[in-house]
Swiss-Prot record:
PANTHER family: UNDECAPRENYL-DIPHOSPHATASE. InterPro entries: UppP. Catalyzes the dephosphorylation of undecaprenyl diphosphate (UPP). Confers resistance to bacitracin. Its main location: membrane. The gene is uppP. It catalyses: di-trans,octa-cis-undecaprenyl diphosphate + H2O = di-trans,octa-cis-undecaprenyl phosphate + phosphate + H(+). Its EC number is 3.6.1.27. Disulfide bonds: none annotated. The chain crosses the membrane at residues 3-23, 43-63, 85-105, 109-129, 178-198, 203-223, 238-258, 269-289. This is Undecaprenyl-diphosphatase. It is found in: Cell inner membrane. The keyword Membrane applies. It is an enzyme of class 3 (hydrolase). NCBIfam families: PRK00281.1-2.
């Protein structure tokens, strides 16, 4: 195995694992990293699909007990049935839009300038969402009115994934559609969208993880099938390296993020997005880095 190629696989695998579930856009980072490492040819595109599969398996492993409970309870447990319906409902909008506009989006928006712009806009949206969160609880409601107490200043009305209904799921699914633009971030769109629609930060994050499973798994299978003619046994070693590092880094990232959101907001990610986006635009405009359109 070529050492330089293996090192690229390690770097990209780690980039995928660390960015897939943070609100900073894995696709955007892979587009930029792929260009910097000169690994954005057809083989590189297939490689990205493989490492995404590694990342999603990390989520499946982390939530294996919950997934097993839902699957085993589909026949008789109402809570499991409602949860499965919510995931399906939230998945449909992005699938429909991807089937209709997917080719156009890849042809026109998969470039560093679009990614950088989406980084900045997404960062601003996160800051606005967190500003709204910070105002919650500062407006007091009349004592004795339970409904107003629960909803004062737009306080989260959903504190458990099991409390979601199909309308809530559909709203999150519609928010996920924005993630079709590279640089937006699927997790960022679903988490921030969920928070804006009344989910607590923890619930929005957890539901985003579950929602990633059918979305990324389905996209992986579909893209690998389309690229099957380009698959070669000679590439299995590189694919395996990237897959393993994506799985491990994603597993650690998911566990860390679940702890992080319990006591922190997403402002650090927002500022990172804005700063990173500005840097990419500046390097493009000054010619320091020759980003390809």
């Amino acid at each position: 195995m070529d050492i330089a190629l293996a090192l690229k696989a390690v770097i990209l695998g780690i980039v995928e694992g660390l960015t897939e579930f943070l609100p900073i856009s894995s696709t955007g980072h892979l587009i930029l990293a792929g260009q910097l490492l000169d690994f954005n040819d057809e083989k590189g595109k297939i490689f990205e699909i493989v490492i995404q599969f590694g990342a999603i398996l990390a989520v499946c492993w982390e939530f294996r007990q919950r997934i097993g409970t839902v699957i085993s309870g589909l026949a008789s447990d109402v809570k499991s049935q409602r949860f499965a319906v919510n995931v399906i409902v939230a998945t449909i909008p992005a699938i429909v839009l991807a089937l209709v506009f997917g080719k156009w989006i890849k042809a026109h928006l998969f470039n560093p300038i679009t990614v950088a712009t989406a980084f900045i806009i997404g960062g601003v949206v996160i800051l606005l969402a967190e500003w709204r969160e910070a105002r919650r609880g500062t407006v007091s409601a009349p004592q004795g009115n339970a409904l107003l107490e629960a909803a004062k200043a737009g306080a989260p009305r959903i504190e458990s994934v099991d409390d979601l209904n199909w309308r809530d799921a559909l709203k999150v699914g519609l928010a996920q559609c924005f993630a079709l633009v590279p640089g937006t971030s699927r997790s960022g769109a679903t988490i921030i969208g969920g928070m804006l629609f009344g989910l607590s930060r923890q619930v929005a994050t957890e539901f985003s993880f579950f929602l990633a499973i059918p979305v990324i798994f389905g996209a992986t299978v579909y893209e690998l099938y389309k690229a099957r003619a380009l698959l070669s046994a000679d590439d299995l070693g590189i694919f395996a390296v990237g897959f393993v590092f994506a799985f491990l880094s994603a597993f650690l990232c998911v566990r860390w993020l679940l702890r992080f959101v319990a006591t922190h907001d997403f402002k650090p990610f927002a500022w990172y997005r804005i700063a990173f986006g500005i840097i990419v635009l500046l390097t493009a405009w000054t010619g320091v880095i020759s980003w390809h359109a």
